[in-house]
């Protein structure tokens, strides 16, 4: 299923490695206290999502990621040799001769910038959703790790493969986007147009359970045909008691904005959800820069290919973080950085940049990305977008020379750099594959 979803761009060796190692990492999570739903017989209550041929997804109600994070953080806090710096923001990686030696880090509360030197540095900075604005990602998903790595010439790959989750809750009165899990369709929910047509069978034999790229592209086509602002997820035929047991957060969130799932369809539309590309790494998480590692959504491991299979990201993060640890633990402790002396960070000015400039440019970027570099792209839009983003990038470089560093400005700078990587990759790719589609592209992955 992973290979099919990845549409020919998965690294088969990586796929086999993750699938083989996955059960051990799951057991480790459970040993650390993660609790996953079980059926009446005490076995895992396995869910099914788009692209999966079987029920195989271990979950915790409709908050699996939260439960995994809770268990890992609790375990981390138990370790005396782990120190967590809250309210600290990494600005730049420290590098010399293609080798990373740590990072310059901003204390958000004191505005002090410190040098965090390290023999090895691991980026686990998550996704890039805020580049689009209309996203299921949190506000901190500004692509910081990818941008920092790019600035020290680490190789990035396949940044054009942006996964749009097909069913984010549509609601005009809210700026944040709430995710309606694909497991709801696996549970039996139907996608419908405003007129009630179940349209997915027109696009894929798997219907509502097709992979995310196909469902998102199909919804995009339907909305452009009809002029409607959303489609609908129909759960009115499902057992409401069973639904609330499986999806309590989805039920309560819909109810809070006046949607009665038992009687009403849920308005949904695609939103940016996941970056399938990222910082290129090998099977030990090593980047092209010595002593720099990357893991999770900011990395490109070869697992997802052109499109991620639902729920594979959590598995990937667990397997690769463990492999990075095992690799580093096998190396002799040389403490190379102690002999190195790096200059302190110097701000060009004591004055902060006008926040309205940052907010305006960020909003303009998000509108541009949504409009010109969305689910379906074309070269004329991409070339126009590239020109504008390059202009903003040059403006950011000039601003940095004149003003004091702030987290908000650096997030904007990182978002613009990531947007450039996405648009360049989109222009260079000349075939439709997985989650990538250009309407003026005649060649497809299956046309060879």
Label each residue range with its predicted role.
Residues 9-12, 26-43, 83, 155-158, ...:
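A short alpha-helix-loop-beta-strand transition element characteristic
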Residues 1-18:
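Glycine-rich active-site loop/strand segments that organize a redox cofactor
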Residues 118-120, 124-129, 298-299:
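Glycine-/small-residue-rich beta->alpha transition segments that form the dinucleotide
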Residues 28, 34-55, 192-208, 219-222, ...:
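Glycine- and aromatic-enriched mobile tails/lids
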Residues 63, 109, 113, 132-140, ...:
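Alpha-helix capping and helix-loop boundary segments enriched in small/acidic/polar residues
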Residues 148, 154-266, 318, 327-332:
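An anion/pyrophosphate-binding glycine-rich loop and adjacent beta-alpha core
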Residues 30-112, 117, 124, 168-172:
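Conserved redox-cofactor binding core of oxidoreductases
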Residues 92-110, 114-115, 259-301:
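FAD-site-proximal beta/loop scaffold in flavoenzymes
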